[in-house]
Amino acid sequence: MKVIGVRFRKAGKIYFFDPLDMDIKQGMNVIVETARGVEYGFVVMGVRDVEEEKIVQPLKPVLRIATPEDDMIQNQNHEKEQAAFGICLEKIKKHGLDMKLIDSEYTFDNNKLLFYFTADGRIDFRELVKDLAAVFKTRIELRQIGVRDETKIMGGIGICGRSLCCHTYLSEFAPVSIKMAKEQNLSLNPTKISGVCGRLMCCLKNEEEAYEELNNKLPNVGDFVTTKDGLRGEVQSVSVLKQLVKVIVTLENDEKEVKEYHVTDLRFKPRRKRDHMQMDNELRQLELLEKKEGKSHLDDA
């Protein structure tokens, strides 16, 4: 089935649409109908064939390729969103609500105005919605998001010195666990493996597969191995990327010495799976927060 891939916000989720017979290419803007209404989207994937089982049905058609008039309306909407953000801030203050406004967004047809916010708990914003509806004369939706979504919208610089992955290119948040940091021999200090959002860094997922494969070729620290020169010893440390192993071997005079070998020069039993890890309370809380955060609520289009 032929489809195109469309995003509605930077680094947002990609949605499939039916291009019909239109000559739509990557980089174009299109007008499509979504569950939220008529939307203006950016084509990030040109026409291509996708297996039908991978498509969420019903597949909606592209209404049209965006015209200069559509581009102008979209720019006007962005200006209106900035004004709406300021008004909403004033209304939140007026109602004394303990919530942090993050972003505002108009649908292309102006039939709905969405406000994204964070808060520690549930917020009764019914009176606020009535107040906003009276001002903007359109449907109002207030959507509570998590700290990861907040960071995705706001952007920032990671400890690597680069723009945040979630703000730059990540469409969706992948599950991240402390085990990934452990596999990569990283410090388990929460301040070292947490991102700007205070959750585990998304980039821990990037090299998970490679480290898992490399680790499976190595013995565990504490395992006993036999070296190529016939010595038997205990593994002191391993270098995952270099595939080197430091072994405490016993020499003929019963003296002990630390020698370094490439993993191919050692014989040992297959690596034991060590899923159980000692975690302090801070790490455990970080892991629980990851599970509690759940999926993103930015792209419920």
Predicted segments — roles?
Residues 1-187:
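Acidic-enriched and Gly/Ser
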Residues 13-15, 39-41, 231-233, 256-261:
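Short beta-strand segments
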Residues 239-260:
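Basic/aromatic-rich interaction segments and small domains that mediate binding to polyanionic partners
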Residues 258-301:
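Intrinsically disordered, low-complexity linker and terminal regions at domain boundaries
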Residues 236-237, 271:
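Mixed-charge, low-complexity intrinsically disordered segments
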Residues 32, 226-228:
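A generic structural signal for residues embedded in beta-strands
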